[in-house]
Amino acid sequence: MKSIELVLALVLSAIIAGYIISYLISLNRVEPKEITFHAVEEILVNLNNFKEFSLPSRALVEVKPATLVLNGIEVNASQVLLMWKSEENVVLQGAYKGEAWSLWANNSYIGVISWIAIQDNGVELKIVFFTSSEKELKHISYSSSKVVFRGAFRNLRVSFNGIKVCEVEGFRKVLVEEISIKG
């Protein structure tokens, strides 16, 4: 009889502990504040100009794995999504528009998603992508970059997550850097 009571006490204790843990986890979940579409457009301009600035409210940060392809050579990269609750019902795919960042929205949230930045001086092609270890940000700053790939190519084709980003004729040294976004 005592073994049944012990088993029941253990099961009951486990159920209670599970409820307490799930409650504590929900307390730590950060819900972003709502933000206007216009405010996100201003954030986009600052990000595309690589400025350090304060955000109007805390943004949730999500980092997604991505693939950078240089003439068939795959380089592991990432995309950073900064998002807030949306006041408007907007859906934007976050398509690549030739800049490092683009607008993104899904009816509930609105934000910006990173792509890659490319600088070509005719000799060296520098490609930058972004990452972050933060869960949320109130301020945008950039840490020093980390070189993740060096190479040299003739007639280079660059794609990012399956999207053709650029094609360069002639010989280029290529440098791929990862820049971390901090708060």
Where are the regions that the model predicts?
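An almost-null, non-specific background feature
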Residues: 13-19, 33, 49, 136
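N-terminal exported-region signature
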Residues: 22, 177-181
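Membrane-proximal N-terminal amphipathic helix
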Residues: 26-57
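Short, structured protein-protein interaction patches enriched in aromatics and acidic/basic residues
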Residues: 55-76
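Aromatic-residue detector
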Residues: 11-13, 29, 40, 171-174
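N-terminal single-pass transmembrane signal-anchor helix
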Residues: 1-28
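Serine/threonine-rich low-complexity intrinsically disordered regions
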Residues: 2-3, 31-36, 56, 76, ...
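Intrinsically disordered, low-complexity regions enriched in Pro/Ser/Thr/Gly and acidic residues
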Residues: 71-173, 182
